[in-house]
């Protein structure tokens, strides 16, 4: 409670990653969007702590990077740069020629999605190691998250 400082709720969850992972997958951080607290792979009502069953985010592929967010999407590494469309609850791969860095490396800002170069020197085999900026272009193609 912001006026009293009292704890309003607590919650525990299985984040579906083994303890002591070897590639950062155990270090994912929460994201707040409007009245939702998203703690991968689940989401909660920020005011009550009630689990929102419609959210059950499952990254496909390698997912060591931390999430970032806009008002309508989550962004993260799922092998490649990936967008999770909150309204549709669908994944959309942004590109397949690169991978974002292992920290918060996909920045939605001003209608663009920016991915600063953060993979050079990595042993992953992706062709493009450069900073990129993406503009919206029509209806995105999506894939199921289940």
Where on the chain are the PLM-derived regions?
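Repeat-blade elements of multi-bladed beta-propeller folds
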Residues: 11, 15, 19-42, 59-81, ...
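Hydrophobic beta-strand positions in blades of beta-propellers and related beta-sheet-rich domains
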Residues: 1, 41-44, 80-84, 131
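Aromatic (tryptophan-biased) beta-strands that constitute blades/sheets of beta-rich domains
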Residues: 1-21, 48-63, 87-97, 102, ...
């Amino acid at each position: 409670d912001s006026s009293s400082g009292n704890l309003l709720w607590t919650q525990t969850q299985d984040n579906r990653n083994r303890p002591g992972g070897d590639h950062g997958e155990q270090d994912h951080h929460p994201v707040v969007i409007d009245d939702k607290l998203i703690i991968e792979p689940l989401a909660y009502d920020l005011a009550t702590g009630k689990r929102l069953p419609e959210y059950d985010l499952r990254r496909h592929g390698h997912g060591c990077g931390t999430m970032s967010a806009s008002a309508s999407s989550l962004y993260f590494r799922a092998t490649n740069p990936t967008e999770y469309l909150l309204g549709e609850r669908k994944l959309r791969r942004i590109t397949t020629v690169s991978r974002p860095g292992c920290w918060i490396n996909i920045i939605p800002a001003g209608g663009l999605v920016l991915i600063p170069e953060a993979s050079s020197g990595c042993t992953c085999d992706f062709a493009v190691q450069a900073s990129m900026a993406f503009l919206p272009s029509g209806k995105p193609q999506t894939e199921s998250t289940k």
